[in-house]
């Protein structure tokens, strides 16, 4: 095996793509700052107990583990940054009011999510802590849509769900809650026959519950799905509140292209309210996922309402129109103090200046040199090529 080969699911990022990703990172973090979000940078590796204390088994399976040579304890390479940021809010900052935090960093997955996914992601996201109301959910979704607009994503579509719908059904039927994992899998796959088959094998599952689950698998489409859900789902405690929360968000975003999918229950057990995903026309899967997760911070000794989102910058950049090569000024290499001073002034003004080393006049693949720094009438002057 060649020494240049990388593990499966990992890849180098070459100059043009790396430049595009870095430009996106700067643009988006600057955008989040205009909303009042503060940047934090948690470590790449933590004790596994801390990384997984507030999440389910899915994240455990995605986390690469190793032994700390200093303490002998098990460490984890983060597979998601959300729990780390939650720890910072709950334990380190320890603020009483609303806190807005954003972040960007690499995460590593033990296995790729699917055949088209990478194992190393550059995760960027934002979280609001300390407010349980609809206003925080709306602000996060507005920031998501601004994020994609800033990046240049065309025809973004917002897909809404609410974990309270599923939770209301399970709370009304304890037998159903015992099979939550299998039921959620079938619902995500919209597998109505599979739901019927599972119901036939589970003793004590109520007929109303079976009908509700089968109806739930078909409740996806436009905003009118919420009204249909009120008719078809049982009026159990918590159901009306969840549907009201969805309707409030729909009413607050009249200009957003959106859909409602009440069977998108992938975050059940983690999320505690509104959840969402955003899709773009040039990507095979959701670009952004997020939602409310009020119970997660309890693992760090402090209950705090929370809502947020994250996305993979590499995945986002890969589907965008390739950036034009950067424009640059070509300059000769030399030790003339006047040349050195001219190059320094141009760079300080924000220009890219590439000094051509002797014998390498054609080696400027990453840049388009449309100007050059030339000695004219005893002075170094920029002229158009």
From Swiss-Prot:
One of its GO terms (molecular function) is histidine-tRNA ligase activity. It comes from the Bacteria. SUPFAM superfamilies: Class II aaRS and biotin synthetases. GO terms for cellular component: cytoplasm. Keywords: Amino-acid biosynthesis, Cytoplasm, Histidine biosynthesis. Pathway: Amino-acid biosynthesis; L-histidine biosynthesis; L-histidine from 5-phospho-alpha-D-ribose 1-diphosphate: step 1/9. One of its GO terms (biological process) is L-histidine biosynthetic process. Signal peptide: none annotated. It is found in: Cytoplasm. Pfam families: tRNA-synt_His. Heteromultimer composed of HisG and HisZ subunits. This function is generally fulfilled by the C-terminal part of HisG, which is missing in some bacteria such as this one. Belongs to the class-II aminoacyl-tRNA synthetase family. HisZ subfamily. Required for the first step of histidine biosynthesis. May allow the feedback regulation of ATP phosphoribosyltransferase activity by histidine. This is ATP phosphoribosyltransferase regulatory subunit. It comes from Bordetella pertussis (strain Tohama I / ATCC BAA-589 / NCTC 13251). The lineage of its organism: Bacteria, Pseudomonadati, Pseudomonadota, Betaproteobacteria, Burkholderiales.
